Each structure stands twice: as C-alpha cells, then as structure tokens.
C-alpha cells in the first residue's frame, strides 16, 4: 500500500475486523458433524407403524446400583453373575428409555411417521418433568448410569434438533422442557466427574465427557463444550508412547476390551470439537490415532496386550461388530488404511444406542445398508 496515511487509517479497522471475526467464531452456535443435518428419508403414512411401547417409569429414586464386578479385586475384571442380574433388573427402565429413544429416532429418520416422533418426545418429556436421574444419592455405578443415559438421549436428540427436515419446529414446548433437563443433568455429570485424580480417570470419565459434549451441542452451551474438551485432553494425555492406557491395562484379561471401550467417546468428542473449530487430533502427538492403531493391532494379535500386562486377553466383547462403532468418526478424523476401511465396511452399519443410534448413517451414509455377507 503506497499511501501511508491510508494505511494508518485502515490499520485499526483491520484489527477491529480481526477481533470481530474471532468473537463471531467464538459466538457461533455449536453444531454437530454434517451427517446430523440429514433430512428424514421419507414421510410415510398409513397403519404400518410399530406403535408406541409402554413408557418406562421415570427413575427418580437413589442412583445406588450394584456393580457387575461386585466382589472382584482392584482390577474390576471378573464378572459377578448375580450382581450383574441385580444391576440389569434395577436399571431396566433407564436402559429401556435409552434403547427406545435411539430406536424410535432411527425409525423416524427413516420413515417420518409423526407417531414415532410423538412417542419419543412424550417419553423424554415425561422423564424431564419427573426430574428423573437427578438424585444426589448415588454410588459409582449410579453416577455411571446417569452419564451413559444422558449421552444416549442427547446424541439421539441431536438428530432431531439439527435435521434439515426440522421435525421439532412444531414441538418447541417439549424441546424446551427436554433441553432444560439435559442441561441440568449435564451440570450434575460435570459435578460427578470433574477433577478426579489421574489414577481414577479412566473410560468412565471419557464417557462422561461425551455425554456433556453431546449435551453442549443439544443446548448450545459453550461452558459444557469447554469442559468436554478439557476432559478429552486429560484422557488422551494418559495414552503412552506405545498407544496404551495405563489405567485400562490394570483391567487384566479385559485390558484390550477396555482400551477399545475407551475409544468411542474420545473419537466422538474429537469429531464434534473439529466441526466447532477445535482440532484435537494432534493432542499428545496424535494420541487418539495411536490408541486406535494399538487396539486394532491388539485385535489382530492380542499377545501384544498379554506381553504388556501378563494376562491372556478375553476377546468375547471384541467379537461384536458394534463395539467398533468408533471407526466411523475415527476414519473421518484420520486417514484410515485400506485394510481398516475394509474391516469397517465389513462391519457396517454401526448402530449403538450409547452414541445415539446409527453412526454409519451419520458418518458414512453411502454404506448405511451395510456390506455384511457381500
């Protein structure tokens, strides 16, 4: 620029524009990844709807539940069949709500039947009005159920809230009630899991952070978003140079399964952060990629984990395709190798209620019908 006077006059303006742009970016409404904006496939009518199941009773009691590892030693790796049954029985209404919400939202996004939407919103509104899952009387298993349920519900709800079909446009009152409940529950989840000592920060904290991330987008709360990012950083900074998580290695024969279980919430948080201008991929020298690669290598050769912690690995959980749903967000964050892509395609579609339903439809819609048996 030749005119020094003009340059001087423009300088503050350019600075102001830069500040404004930064502020605008910070103030931009939080959003989910692009796949969550998908419209409803078809709006069907007629009597082929599956109807609305009986609503599970809103759970308002103390969140005091028996652990399925009750009686196990510090490793928490040996299943107690009796206490697992007691846990399943006492939490049945909660998991029915989680599974039912994910299922109905998937059905509605496919078929667009108003009764599917009404059923989902009626369930969530009733639980919200009952102030369910908000008890301050809880044990570790109880606060774990709270954050799992919140993550399931909020991530399913996001598909309704952001769909280009705008299904909530005629349901603003219910939406406000539901979002206020999610918001309040997320505050409690933050309180439940914040600032734990590192030796107690494990996959539970990552799942708590995922529930708060999903809620931050559902309710447009930047403070919740920031907390989820903070917890993500704590989590991936626990990944060592070889891609192991020391606290999950303690799980003895279930160490590999728990490394795999740590990946879905971390990959989802990174994916949601990415579309909101926060790139977490390189945190701790690409720790998320390192962890994912270590797990995939461990699935091929479990001896890697046995050599590390001295225990032969229990592969039961890892025979279920849906346990690898984290590959959907992971392979959008990083470039997955052709053999990993082939593995992913062989397992699709990935449907898991704890992440809000059908992740293949969100992240890789061209493969939503799956390739099993082809």
Swiss-Prot record:
CDD domains: AlgLyase. Substrate binds at residues 67-68, 140-141, 258. It holds the Pfam family Alginate_lyase. GO terms for cellular component: periplasmic space. One of its GO terms (molecular function) is poly(beta-D-mannuronate) lyase activity. It catalyses: Eliminative cleavage of alginate to give oligosaccharides with 4-deoxy-alpha-L-erythro-hex-4-enuronosyl groups at their non-reducing ends and beta-D-mannuronate at their reducing end. It is found in: Periplasm. GO terms for biological process: alginic acid catabolic process. Gene3D superfamilies: Chondroitin AC/alginate lyase. Keywords: Lyase, Periplasm, Signal. InterPro entries: Alginate_lyase, Alginate_lyase_dom, Chondroitin_lyas. Its EC number is 4.2.2.3. Its main location: periplasm. Residues 1-26 form the signal peptide. Belongs to the polysaccharide lyase 5 family. Catalyzes the depolymerization of alginate by cleaving the beta-1,4 glycosidic bond between two adjacent sugar residues via a beta-elimination mechanism. May serve to degrade mislocalized alginate that is trapped in the periplasmic space. This is Alginate lyase. The gene is algL.
